[in-house]
Each structure stands twice: as structure tokens, then as C-alpha cells.
């Protein structure tokens, strides 16, 4: 399932990977600051976009329009990659391997199957890796730069959290596609009128049955244009505010817009809608433990045996769990409280500790458990279900505000970077 992010690591990445091609003399397609976009980059992306469109049975615009979109995408990528190089942004091999493994998993493939699929489609695996690395650098630079421009006030979180709470039962997620008809900075009235006329003409075409994906590829200046403008699933509150109101009564299949923003005119298509329950209840546990840490004077095995003896003494009534914790436990945070860890959700604990704890019944004590901290005796004192809806709503409100503001800021930021860069297109 896709989220409403500007860039995603998914199978669509394959569409950004250059094809292996016969060795010919390469040419410069565009100069971007102190870098270049090569004809092979344009041709490779052109071929792979066509391949993906064919696999998705999606119509494409004419080659000249598609080439323009691809050129703009590669120019923007080059600008951001140059920024990343200046900032020293690097993606390790481990991060890259994990990202590729996630892509394979999202598409229900093993890595070997993914390699085979790439080869079948004529894609070189090393070239694919390099492209994914570039996409990760681009994403990190953009995310870091845009987030620095965003401020979220506590009052905003409180206000949106209340709205989310009031709308819990009627909450809806939307699957959207998007077309952006751009405006330059400080546009003239003629430029605004021309862009609005173009947007209205596209709305008319879409409402009369034209393929929205093809229209997006042909006309949209949004980063998702080459994916047919697909934004995927998300909550209405995660969208820019100017979109949310326009979509409040939208139905499946509706074409909404044009909507004016600071960067241009937006057109939205509602591909689908679905509801979702917002009530959130979690199970908390009240536990206590005794921790022994292996050291130069206590081996791992000695720590385990010592805990077995302590457990036997507790069971026989020779001592209590609390007294033993105060005497023996090496956890400075809980020893003086008789090992009491208070109420918490199990997922905050070390995995081995958590797994052992969740297997216990109320009042039951575990056998010695080994974790990354050492050896534990664990006793489950009680469990309870807690309504976390309010806290979850505030957390969700913060993330919605971040997504909303990020979407608005990212478009402005990218427009600024494009306007301030030296770009000379040498081929058409």
C-alpha cells in the first residue's frame, strides 16, 4: 500500500533504472550547474517508463511530451544529487541492501526472483542498485531540507486531534491521483489565466472519459507524473488544507478541481474510498524482574544458576521476589523498587524479555531468561486494557500535519531549487 509521500521505494523504482544499451558515443542532453544529464539517461528512462506502462496497460502521451517530462525529472534529480554531494550524504551498502530487500518483499519476491525479473526486463542489477542509491540520496536530501522549513505548533496538534476525534466514526481514506499545472514564481495575470484554462480543459477531458493517468503523464509537473499521478491511499487530513475541503464530499470516480495553490493549479481524481475504525486500545503489563549481568567475576552460566537458586528460594517462601530484587538485582532503575517496572506496553522491552513476559499468566514467574542485558527472572503482576485513543489521535494529528505541510513545502522547495539552478537543455 502506498502512502502519500513525494517519493517511495517500491516497484515503481524499476521505472527509474536505465536499460543496458549498445556502446555508442554518449551525448549531453542538458547541463545542470556543474553536472550533466546524458542522452543515455533520457533514453534509458524513456524505455523503462514505456515498459512499466505496457505492463500496467497504461496509455502514454506522444514521445515529445513524455521526453519533456523525463528531462524535467532528471534535471531535478541532478540538482538534488549535487546538493547531497555537497552535504556529504551517503547511503551505506547495508542501507541499500535493506531497501532492495524491502522492495522485493513488497512485491512478493525473493532477491533471486527480483534479479531474474530485472534480467528478464533487460535491466542490469548493478545499474538498478546505483539508481536505488540515488533515489535514497534524493529522498534524504529533500526530506531533510523540507522538514527544516516546517513548524508545527502544539495548538495545531490539539485542534486537529479534536477534529480527528469528532470524525472517528465517519473517517475515510481516499485513493487519489493528482495533476499539477505549474505557475512560475510571481506569475503575471496572463500566465495565471493560461494555466487555469489549461487546467479546466484537462478537467473537462477527464470528466468526459479521458484516461487520467495519460493526462498526468502528459501535463503534470508533479513528481508522481510518470506514475500516472498516482498518490495512493491516505487520510483526508494528511492532504494540504486546500485539498481537504474540496474532497470532503467527494465520491469514487469524482474529478475535483482545478484548485489554485502557490505553485499552480491542482486536479484530483478519487480512485476509491474506504472507512477505518479509529478506536485504539492497547494491553499494558505490570511486571517486575531481577537482573544479573555476566561479568569477569560472574560467568554467563553462573548468573543463570544463581537466578535458578533465587527462584527456588522465592517459591519455597525463604524470601520474597521484592526482597530478592533489592538484594541481588543489578538493574539500577528498578532494584530499589523491588524490581517493579510499573505499567508499560510489552513492545518497549528487549525482544527476548518481551516474548517471555507475554507467555506468562498473571502471578506467574518465569525461568531464567537471557536478553541483551543479561539474565532475568520475570514475574507478571497484572495486565490491563488501556484506551489510548486520545494519545494516538494527537500522534496521528502530528503526523498528518507533517505530511500536509511537507506536501505543500516540498513543491515550493523544488520550484525554488529549479529556478535557482543553471540549466541548459541541449537536445529536444
UniProtKB/Swiss-Prot annotation:
Pfam name, any one: SurA_N
SUPFAM superfamilies xref list: FKBP-like, Triger factor/SurA peptide-binding domain-like
Keyword vocabulary terms for this entry: Chaperone, Isomerase, Periplasm, Repeat, Rotamase, Signal
GO molecular function: peptide binding; peptidyl-prolyl cis-trans isomerase activity; unfolded protein binding
EC identifiers of the protein: 5.2.1.8
Keyword Transferase belongs to the record: no
PROSITE patterns, per the entry: PPIC_PPIASE_1, PPIC_PPIASE_2
Signal sequence coordinates: 1-20
Localisation per UniProt entry: Periplasm
GO biological process: chaperone-mediated protein folding; Gram-negative-bacterium-type cell outer membrane assembly; maintenance of stationary phase; maintenance of unfolded protein; protein folding; protein stabilization
Entry superkingdom: Bacteria
Record-annotated PpiC domain positions: 171-272, 282-382
Stated role: Chaperone involved in the correct folding and assembly of outer membrane proteins, such as OmpA, OmpF and LamB. Recognizes specific patterns of aromatic residues and the orientation of their side chains, which are found more frequently in integral outer membrane proteins. May act in both early periplasmic and late outer membrane-associated steps of protein maturation. Essential for the survival of E.coli in stationary phase. Required for pilus biogenesis.
Domains as described in the record: The PPIase activity resides only in the second parvulin domain. The N-terminal region and the C-terminal tail are necessary and sufficient for the chaperone activity of SurA. The PPIase activity is dispensable for SurA function as a SurA protein with a deletion of the parvulin domains is almost completely functional in vivo. The N-terminal region and the C-terminal tail are also required for porin recognition.
Protein name: Chaperone SurA
Amino acid at each position: 500500500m502506498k502512502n502519500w509521500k513525494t517519493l517511495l521505494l517500491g516497484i515503481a523504482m524499476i521505472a527509474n533504472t536505465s536499460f543496458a544499451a549498445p556502446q555508442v558515443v554518449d551525448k549531453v542532453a542538458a547541463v545542470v550547474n556543474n553536472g550533466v544529464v546524458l542522452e543515455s539517461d533520457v533514453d534509458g528512462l524513456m524505455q523503462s517508463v514505456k515498459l512499466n506502462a505496457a505492463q500496467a496497460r497504461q496509455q502514454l502521451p506522444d514521445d515529445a511530451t513524455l521526453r519533456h517530462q523525463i528531462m524535467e525529472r532528471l534535471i531535478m534529480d541532478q540538482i538534488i544529487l549535487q546538493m547531497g554531494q555537497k552535504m556529504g550524504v551517503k547511503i551505506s551498502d547495508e542501507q541499500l541492501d535493506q531497501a532492495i530487500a524491502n522492495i522485493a518483499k513488497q512485491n512478493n519476491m525473493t532477491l533471486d526472483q527480483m534479479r531474474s525479473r530485472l534480467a528478464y526486463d533487460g535491466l542490469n542489477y548493478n545499474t538498478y542498485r546505483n539508481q536505488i542509491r540515488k533515489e535514497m540520496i534524493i529522498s534524504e536530501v529533500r526530506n531533510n531540507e523540507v522538514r527544516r522549513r516546517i513548524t508545527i505548533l502544539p495548538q495545531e496538534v490539539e485542534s486537529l486531534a479534536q477534529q480527528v476525534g469528532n470524525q472517528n466514526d465517519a473517517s475515510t481514506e481516499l485513493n487519489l491521483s493528482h495533476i499539477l499545472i505549474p505557475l512560475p514564481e510571481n506569475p503575471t495575470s496572463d500566465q495565471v489565466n493560461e494555466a487555469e484554462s489549461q487546467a479546466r480543459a484537462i478537467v473537462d477531458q477527464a470528466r468526459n472519459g479521458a484516461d487520467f493517468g495519460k493526462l498526468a503523464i502528459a501535463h503534470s509537473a508533479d513528481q508522481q507524473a510518470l506514475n500516472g499521478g498516482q498518490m495512493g491511499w491516505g487520510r483526508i487530513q494528511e492532504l494540504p488544507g486546500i485539498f481537504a475541503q474540496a474532497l470532503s464530499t467527494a465520491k469514487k470516480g469524482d474529478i475535483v478541481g482545478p484548485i489554485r495553490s502557490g505553485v499552480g493549479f491542482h486536479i484530483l481524481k478519487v480512485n476509491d474510498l474506504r472507512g477505518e475504525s479509529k478506536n485504539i486500545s492497547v494491553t499494558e503489563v505490570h511486571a517486575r524482574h531481577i537482573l544479573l549481568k555476566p561479568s569477569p567475576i560472574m560467568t554467563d552460566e553462573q548468573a543463570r544458576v544463581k537466578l535458578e537458586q533465587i527462584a527456588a528460594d522465592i517459591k519455597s517462601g525463604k524470601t520474597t521476589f521484592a526482597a530478592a530484587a533489592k538484594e541481588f538485582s543489578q538493574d539500577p532503575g528498578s532494584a530499589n523498587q523491588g524490581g517493579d517496572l510499573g505499567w508499560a506496553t510489552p513492545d518497549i522491552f528487549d525482544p527476548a524479555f518481551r516474548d517471555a513476559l507475554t507467555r506468562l499468566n498473571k502471578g506467574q514467574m518465569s525461568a531464567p531468561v537471557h536478553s541483551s542485558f543479561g539474565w532475568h527472572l520475570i514475574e507478571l503482576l497484572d495486565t490491563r486494557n488501556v484506551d489510548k485513543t486520545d494519545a494516538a489521535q494527537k500522534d496521528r494529528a502530528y503526523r498528518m500535519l507533517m505530511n500536509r505541510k511537507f506536501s505543500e513545502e516540498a513543491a515550493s522547495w523544488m520550484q525554488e531549487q529549479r529556478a535557482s539552478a543553471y540549466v541548459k537543455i541541449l537536445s529536444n
